[in-house]
Amino acid sequence: MQIIQTKQQYICYNPELLTETPEMAFSSEFWQQQNKIIGSAQGRGTTWFVQGEKLAMALRHYRRGGLFGKLVADSYLFSGWDKTRSVAEFSLLNHLIAHQVNVPKPVAARAVRLGWFRYQADILVEKIANSRDLVGILGQETLSQQVWFDVGAMIKRMHDAGVCHTDLNCHNIILDDHKTVWIIDFDKCYRLEGANWQEKNLARLHRSFIKEQGKRGILFNEDNWQWLCKVIRVNGNKGQ
């Protein structure tokens, strides 16, 4: 990892993955001028998918949600560079990769101070090729028992790494075209000791499946859930 730091800006990046000028790489206009924008997705803002020299990436600007987000859309209280949303997510992704959890590779993170007390943030991460989230897949087809085992195993691996995914839901678990399981979107996630929190984390995921089953009619049932939890239970967590 390399760092570029001034009084107003902090950038950390992986030079093996980002060969473009780091200061320019967080601008969608830069990628547009290079004709390197390959897609986009809408959430709290626009996530731009761009083609770098080394890999395809997702460029995301951090934005708040909810009512408070309407008042303060994209700035946060500054309490140190390492505690900014982007740098924290960059570090957490590297931690997960070191523990063999399938997550997007962090490419670069930036935080820019706004005066003394606030900052804005952006992150570039690997774009997982030919992937869909579980909601999209289950809206069209069922998954095999083995895939549900694999989903449970990847969640267990994340928990064993001591990481609580605070927004663990069926939109944030994706499969690529080889049916490899990936977990995404680690903004505001953090490390925790012990295992007491893991059951609540699984319960959150279970609620998301039930919600999407009622909302979109996804092809999910309780047998699927038991298959997912089986690997976790064998390894010492009782799950839902």
From Swiss-Prot:
Its EC number is 2.7.1.166. Pfam families: Kdo. It comes from the Bacteria. It is a peripheral membrane protein. Keywords: ATP-binding, Cell inner membrane, Cell membrane, Kinase, Lipopolysaccharide biosynthesis, Membrane, Nucleotide-binding, Transferase. Pathway: Bacterial outer membrane biogenesis; LPS core biosynthesis. Gene3D superfamilies: Transferase(Phosphotransferase) domain 1. It catalyses: an alpha-Kdo-(2->6)-lipid IVA + ATP = a 4-O-phospho-alpha-Kdo-(2->6)-lipid IVA + ADP + H(+). The active site is at 167. GO terms for molecular function: ATP binding; protein kinase activity. One of its GO terms (biological process) is lipopolysaccharide core region biosynthetic process. One of its GO terms (cellular component) is plasma membrane. It is found in: Cell inner membrane. It is an enzyme of class 2 (transferase). Signal peptide: none annotated. Belongs to the protein kinase superfamily. KdkA/RfaP family. Catalyzes the ATP-dependent phosphorylation of the 3-deoxy-D-manno-octulosonic acid (Kdo) residue in Kdo-lipid IV(A) at the 4-OH position. This is 3-deoxy-D-manno-octulosonic acid kinase. The gene is kdkA.
